UniProtKB/Swiss-Prot annotation:
Keywords, in A-Z order: Coiled coil, DNA-binding, Transcription, Transcription regulation
Protein name: Transcription elongation factor GreA
Gene name of the encoded protein: greA
Protein function: Necessary for efficient RNA polymerase transcription elongation past template-encoded arresting sites. The arresting sites in DNA have the property of trapping a certain fraction of elongating RNA polymerases that pass through, resulting in locked ternary complexes. Cleavage of the nascent transcript by cleavage factors such as GreA or GreB allows the resumption of elongation from the new 3'terminus. GreA releases sequences of 2 to 3 nucleotides.
Family to which the UniProt record says this protein belongs: Belongs to the GreA/GreB family.
Residue ranges of the TM segments: none
Length: 158
C-alpha cells in the first residue's frame, strides 16, 4: 500500500479546493459533455478537431477532479497555535526587508497546494520559507535561492 502525500493548507485553502471541486463536478464537467455532443454532430470523428479538443479537455477536467479530491482527502489543516506570536510558522504572514536597504515584502507561508506567489502566498517548501520558518522578528537570515544568497531582516509576523 502506498502512503499518500499530505497537503498542508489553511482552512481557507481547503474551502477553495472544495469550491473548485464542486464547480468541476457540476458546471465544468457538463460544459465539456455538451461540447463533445456538439462536436459529434460535425460528422466524421477521425478528422474532427473540435471533437479531439473536447475529449482532451474532458481528460484534463477528470484529471483535475482526481487531483483535487486527493488533495482534499489528504489535507492537513494548518493551525496557528504557536505560543510565541513573534516566531515565523506555517500559516502566518511574515514581513521582511532585503538588506542592506531593500523594500519591505510580506508573504504568507502556506502548504505547496495553496501556494500562489502572485497572491503573496509562498510554499513552506520554498527556499525563502524554509529559511524563515522558526525565526523571530528582528532576526537576520540568509536565504539561499537559485539566483544567489539574499540577506533579509524579519520585521513582522502575524
Amino acid at each position: 500500500m502506498t502512503v499518500e502525500k499530505s497537503y498542508y493548507m489553511t482552512q481557507e485553502g481547503k474551502d477553495k479546493l472544495e469550491e473548485e471541486l464542486h464547480y468541476l463536478k457540476t458546471d465544468r464537467r457538463q460544459e465539456v459533455v455538451e461540447r463533445i455532443k456538439v462536436a459529434r454532430d460535425f460528422g466524421d470523428l477521425s478528422e474532427n478537431s473540435e471533437y479531439d479538443a473536447a475529449k482532451d479537455e474532458q481528460a484534463f477536467v477528470e484529471q483535475r477532479i482526481t487531483q483535487v479530491e486527493k488533495m482534499i482527502r489528504n489535507a492537513v489543516i494548518i493551525e496557528n497555535d504557536n505560543d510565541n506570536p513573534n516566531i515565523v510558522s506555517l500559516g502566518k504572514s511574515v514581513s521582511f526587508v532585503e538588506l542592506p536597504d531593500g523594500d519591505e515584502e510580506t508573504y504568507t507561508i502556506v502548504g505547496s497546494a495553496e501556494a500562489d506567489p502572485f497572491e503573496g502566498k509562498i510554499s513552506n517548501d520554498s527556499p525563502m520559507a524554509t529559511s524563515l520558518l522558526g525565526k523571530e522578528i528582528g532576526e537576520e537570515v540568509t536565504v539561499t535561492t537559485p539566483g544567489g544568497d539574499i540577506d533579509v531582516r524579519i520585521t513582522n509576523v502575524e
